[in-house]
């Protein structure tokens, strides 16, 4: 529903051509980007809010560990080993329940907005601003 969301698809697989056709058919080229095989995944993590791995068959995917280490919310399919979870921001979802995935992504968006609001409220809190102004006057007086 959110037009600001970008889905970055990293890597290649046997369904890539089918997926590209479906994206064009649904007119989602602005929201879904096929990046192919990359060597700069570390940098791409910095641009992400959430990492999604809806895999049908997966052992212990290193990419899931990397995403958690980068402090991302992570959504893994319930087909992936539970040993992968090393972060409280990681969740296992039913691979066959699209609504469960959609709801969790919406929940994460809401959490991020709330966190941003709390940061901004603190940043512009009158007490915090007063302390900063006072520190500047004290430092200015020392010069």
Regions found by a protein language model. Give the residues of each.
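An anion/phosphate-binding loop that grips the pyrophosphate of nucleotide cofactors and donors
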Residues: 48
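Short glycine/serine-rich donor-binding loops of glycosyltransferases
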Residues: 61-65
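A charged, aromatic-enriched C-terminal amphipathic alpha-helix characteristic of glycosyltransferases
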Residues: 112-143
């Amino acid at each position: 529903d959110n037009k600001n969301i970008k889905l970055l698809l990293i890597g290649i697989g046997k369904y890539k051509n089918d997926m590209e056709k479906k994206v064009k058919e649904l007119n989602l080229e602005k929201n879904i980007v096929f990046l192919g095989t990359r060597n700069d995944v570390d940098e791409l993590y910095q641009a992400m809010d959430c990492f999604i791995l809806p895999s049908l068959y997966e052992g212990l995917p290193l990419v899931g560990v990397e995403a958690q280490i980068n402090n991302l919310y992570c959504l893994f399919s319930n087909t992936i080993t539970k040993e992968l979870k090393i972060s409280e921001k990681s969740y296992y979802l039913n691979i066959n329940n699209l609504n469960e995935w959609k709801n969790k992504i919406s929940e994460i968006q809401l959490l991020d907005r709330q966190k941003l609001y709390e940061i901004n409220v603190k940043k512009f809190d009158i007490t915090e601003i007063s302390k900063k102004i006072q520190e500047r006057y004290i430092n200015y007086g020392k010069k």
